[in-house]
Amino acid sequence: DYSDNALNAFRLWCERKYGTIENLNKAWGTTFWGQEMNGFHEVLIPRFMGADSMVNPGQKLDFERFGNDMLLDFYKAERDAIAEICPDKPFTTNFMVSTDQCCMDYADWAEEVDFVSNDHYFHEGESHIDELFCSDALMDSLALGKPWYVMEHSTSAVQWKPLNARKRKGETVRDSIAHVAMGADAINFFQWRASAFG
């Protein structure tokens, strides 16, 4: 998020990562367009300022890494709290590995779950099956030879994409078989029909 708490946590994350503001300035290339900072208190969260604006790519990448680390820490805290009550239960969480959504460092996440699991949704167009194979190959590599699951796989259209195309006849079966052929040990469906809201 973009709250003061997130800003302060991002500044601390940057300080731990770089040690000195000079190291951060060098890594982000802040000499360009006079972006140099004099202290970590000057670090800001990257913000989109309009169609012609530019966000420092090093700053943006580090903010993505920061977000990954914060979410992973939150997952581990939840997992550990539940494990105290249910120590014999396996733990996982839904990855979102696809060619248009993979902004998390799932190699780090894979070490923290008992088995990896993915949400995979239909990509309309000719490249859909190629995208499915690419996503599943990445999941299979993250699983390191252990079972992995497709936690969410739609039967047809969803309600949350800008354009919500329906699957054609046979595509749900084809995609399910393709996931299994690529190594998935379980296929779960969500949702049977697109929600009316949300």
Where are these regions (language model features)?
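Polysaccharide-binding and catalytic clefts of secreted carbohydrate-active enzymes
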Residues: 1-115, 122, 126-132
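Hydrophobic targeting/anchoring helices
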Residues: 92-198
